[in-house]
């Protein structure tokens, strides 16, 4: 299976990439490192990835920033980080990537526990993560080519063992 991992240099990516490389062909992409250097917060960055890689069976996205602070300290620019770099980046990845993903391929996106169980001071993360969860539910109803789409919502990664994260 040929798998494209976006965010392979991040906390989760550094754990799942070696595990997937054992049995699959893995291509990595990221803002600062990877087989392909690309920023998925822009559609041009996403298109650049697919100019360099073809015949993809699965796309795994563990990339995307979001920010939280106390509600009185939040403003449009702070919300915009999660909306642009996490939510819209993953939506655009699906919209563009669907054209390049093989039939019966798979998207795995990432949200986070704050999308379902927010805590005080987490509204920035809650908005982006909750919207990703909703997008995946809606997209699954009509995504073409037999493609599957799912979202994982990890707890704080530092609290999860590597083996539990890989086998989740």
Task: List each language-model region with its residue ranges.
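N-terminal Rossmann NAD(P)H-binding glycine-rich loop of SDR-like oxidoreductase domains
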Residues: 4-19
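Structural signature of the Rossmann-like NAD(P)-dependent dehydrogenase/reductase core
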Residues: 6, 61-64, 106-112, 148-153
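Rossmann-fold cofactor-recognition segment
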Residues: 29-44
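Conserved Rossmann-fold cofactor-binding substructure of NAD(P)-dependent oxidoreductases
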Residues: 40-56
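Conserved mid-core segment of classical short-chain dehydrogenase/reductases
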Residues: 65-80
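Catalytic loop of short-chain dehydrogenase/reductase
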Residues: 82-83, 89-93, 106-141, 153-158
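Alpha-helical segment proximal to the catalytic Tyr-Lys
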Residues: 99, 141-142
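C-terminal helical subdomain
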Residues: 147, 151-168
């Amino acid at each position: 299976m040929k798998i494209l991992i976006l965010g392979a240099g991040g906390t989760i990516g550094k754990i799942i990439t070696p595990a997937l490389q054992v049995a699959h062909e893995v291509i990595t992409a990221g803002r600062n490192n990877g087989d392909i250097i690309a920023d998925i917060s822009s559609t041009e960055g996403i298109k650049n990835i697919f100019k360099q890689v073809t015949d993809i069976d699965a796309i795994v996205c563990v990339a995307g920033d979001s920010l939280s602070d106390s509600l009185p300290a939040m403003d449009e620019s702070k919300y915009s980080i999660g909306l642009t770099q996490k939510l819209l980046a993953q939506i655009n990845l699906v919209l563009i990537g669907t054209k390049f993903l093989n039939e019966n391929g798979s998207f795995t996106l990432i949200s986070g526990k704050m999308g379902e169980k927010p805590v005080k001071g987490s509204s920035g993360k809650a908005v982006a993560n909750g919207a990703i969860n909703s997008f995946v539910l809606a997209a699954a109803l009509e995504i073409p080519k037999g493609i599957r789409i799912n979202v994982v919502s990890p707890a704080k990664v530092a609290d999860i063992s590597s083996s539990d994260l890989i086998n989740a």
